[in-house]
Structures are given as C-alpha cells and as structure tokens.
C-alpha cells in the first residue's frame, strides 16, 4: 500500500529506527515514551511552500506561525505515522531555510515526550546528551546531536501541547501572510536536495 507522506518526506520509519538505535548505543531507550513530532527541513522557501501544500493534503490542521523570524508549519496529520512497530507520530514540524547554523536538510529531528521526569532523565543521561535548547517558557528540550547533523530532542510536553499553551489552535489551516523570504546559503549550498 502506498504511503503518500513517505513519498513527500522520505523513509520516516527508517529515520526513527536509526535514531532509536543510535540512542540505544548511548544507553538511552526511547521505547517507553510517546513521540511528539518529526521535523523536516527544506533549503529554499519555494520548497517549503510546495512541501507544506503536499503535506496539508494529508492533514487536518496547520497553525503556521513565525518563529525566529520565519514561518514554521506544525502539520497535524489526519492519520498519525506508525513507527517502531506501534508508536505513532502525530505531527510534522516543517521548517523553512535555516536561521543560524548548519542543519541537516530533510528529516532532521525526532521529538520524544519524556514528561515531567525530563530533568531527572537529563541527569541520568548527562554524558549522552549534547545540550539543551531554551526555546520558550514551555519548551526547553534536551537533545542529542549526531555526526550527520540530525537530532533527537527530549521534551517535557509534546510540541502540540506547547503550541496550544502559547495560544495557538489546531483548527484548520492558517498561513503567515505577507512574509518575504531572505536569501540564506545552507550546508547543502544553493542547489536543491538530490531526489
């Protein structure tokens, strides 16, 4: 059976399995935890708009908003993606061209919901973690950065819950209007990603 989301973002099952296996070699087992989201990055604005349109065909909501000076889509899928033999990913964070450093284009990170035990989790796994991001009062994930510039982020709350705490609603499709993209060179250069 065809998987239209896989056709758009690539083999997300293999990506999640790879991240799980990499974490296991570092002594971190993510199987007990729910999954928040997958992040997918594109190097050019026109690709962002195109991929957003394709993904929204398989979604029920996208409260797109501006974060760090550029639009960001939070695409709530009509059917969550099944991964790891029974875990589900309900949301795709679609991220336009980068704002500050080198990032992996395509499938870039997996969000894992550790819950209120996330600080204890960080103490237990301190040697395996790369750092912590301070995004806002509701979202300060710990993360592991791998050599290929992909990540796994460990959250107190799912990305959907964070966005709802900030006042957004997943009630249809809302896009940022009148935003003008900046020209930024990414780690993949000015050329599009290979297909």
Predicted regions and their residues:
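Glyoxalase I/VOC metalloenzyme domain signal
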Residues: 1-36, 40-69, 75-195
